[in-house]
């Protein structure tokens, strides 16, 4: 009940700001955890949220994130069929295995080569580091500056081109999913 109240309070905060979230994804994918996924599914139906992002790490094990991927993959909330009756679309979400190594082009090459979904999302947390700024720091286990440098690099653009990966905005992604739900 407290999860439901908290989610409704967060929804009301957005509504008061005249915003309507286009997708659901819980912090560290908590929206797929047992009990919570049922509450989130009710929220999706009640507020007609069009997209739910699902952790979609597929392929061979990557240490140290193998256990996380295994756990998330076996939860019923991680499966598109759990969300089917909500009339929302589901979108696979990749990158859990790269946390802490997101600036490594070889790791990206392996991850992107495994993705078979025509439309999917990958996780990055780029940012600009401000040395000495204790107020706005966080506990992210990687370098946001290194990630920003990586996704702005010529090598990154070349890798995407080589693997035939076309970056699109989230808005374009949702539009494509709505136009072609089987994508």
What is each of the regions a protein language model found here?
Residues 1-23, 34-183:
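Terminal accessory/targeting
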Residues 25-31:
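Active-site histidine-anchored catalytic micro-motif
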């Amino acid at each position: 009940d407290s999860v439901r109240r908290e989610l409704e309070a967060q929804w009301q905060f957005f509504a008061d700001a005249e915003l309507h979230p286009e997708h659901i994804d819980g912090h560290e994918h908590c929206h797929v955890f047992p009990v919570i996924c049922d509450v989130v599914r009710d929220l999706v139906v009640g507020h007609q949220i069009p997209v739910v992002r699902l952790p979609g790490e597929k392929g061979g094990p990557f240490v140290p994130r193998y256990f996380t991927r295994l756990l998330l993959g076996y939860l019923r909330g991680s499966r598109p069929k759990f969300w089917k009756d909500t009339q929302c679309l589901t979108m696979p979400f990749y990158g859990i295995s790269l946390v802490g190594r997101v600036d490594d082009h070889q790791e990206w090459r392996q991850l992107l080569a495994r993705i078979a979904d025509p439309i999917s999302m990958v996780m990055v947390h780029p940012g600009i580091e401000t040395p000495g700024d204790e107020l706005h720091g966080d506990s992210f286990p990687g370098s946001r500056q290194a990630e920003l440098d990586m996704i702005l690099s010529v090598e990154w653009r070349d890798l995407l081109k080589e693997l035939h990966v076309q970056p699109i905005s989230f808005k374009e992604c949702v539009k494509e999913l709505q136009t072609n739900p089987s994508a």
